């Protein structure tokens, strides 16, 4: 018998495979076999037992490396055979380049095995053969799988126009790309001292050209193509795809409200007169296709009030050509602006026991433009105090239905920003706390309140799958929370006063919710 011939016994949890191989050929394969066959008192044995993850695949690889012959003794599907081979190569410390590469461009991994594919990628690091395999196998309903940043960057070659976070400061507007957001990099800044300086120098502005220009609010079109800035000098529109200036609307008034319609064709904005003057009932409409602007007058559009929050609005645009406003009687008026017709008037105050000393704080539309929060304060003095009580009425509003869903009684520090989804309501207040309410079938089934920032929560938002909450504060921190456990997932310093949590879909159907960094808290969202 050949002294170099040994019997290898490969075993896993289900099977045992025995075969003869040349000892020296095995030693030449890798350091793993060299150590195995020259140490541990195995150098003089003729039968070597080896425990492996998959005996069939281990046999195939040994045959391929020692005899230069392809083998698939277990008759596994191509995708499974290839992945198992990669696992074994990693198990014994071999380079994946040693095995025959296969064309994975047309191979699809079943949905039930997709998560194991992602875990293998994260385990092995970058592998060019796995990239097309992941792209081909991803399905839009794989929403519970969290993909690490390095995977996301290799998977998606998406331009900077794909936005996850937009924010503004007194110094300018910041736009963060979703992939670079994960690495905490601001990839483009529209700075007032650069991009904005041309607008400040226009002689047509009806104010001192040296006057500081502030951004009051921002809105991003549903198709993610445009961003509109409501400023103290007028309305500025950027094309986010080309990163170019689209247009500037010059006004004689401060603009505090801006929003897009559902089809991303029109921009609505509210003009405001200077302090001490009554609010204007004029609403401007700018058409992005024609670059033309008109103003419409709305009867009983409420005058601006000193108690209005700085982050809400008393005018908003919902889906299906609906404009919703708060009138001088604190009622919600639902208008089909395409038909120039009032379709519903909702009076929240009729539900209050004492509405003599109440006032609307603001309206807060949901990101899907189907829900509307109407926040009313019952105050004891002319100025809002910590002892004031608030009532939030949440309505479902479309062209056919205008229904009150539920009511939230809120007592405590003044609310600053509210976001609403189909399952959650979150309220950020002026002392750095945020409250979360979960509802089902019109009833609040869970509520909690936690400290999120050292000072005012300037903005708060809910992710599209209701699994995450994003908060921003005057402390300059942007924080991401697990809405189920209320654990902090991640945080970083951004310096923005306002954040907008935007969900988008790339050409591969991957949503941002799949790209959370898990390294900070090591907590995944179930």
UniProtKB/Swiss-Prot annotation:
Q: Which PROSITE patterns match?
A: WD_REPEATS_1, WD_REPEATS_2, WD_REPEATS_REGION
Family matches, as Pfam families: WD40
Q: Which domain of life is it from?
A: Viruses
| SMART domains in the record | WD40 (SM00320)
Q: Does the keyword Repeat apply?
A: yes
Q: Which UniProt keywords apply?
A: Repeat, WD repeat
Q: Does the keyword Repeat apply?
A: yes
Entry-linked InterPro entries: WD40/YVTN_repeat-like_dom_sf (IPR015943), WD40_repeat_dom_sf (IPR036322), WD40_rpt (IPR001680)
Q: Where are the WD repeats?
A: 210-248, 452-491
The name this protein carries in UniProt is Uncharacterized WD repeat-containing protein L344
Organism of provenance = Acanthamoeba polyphaga mimivirus
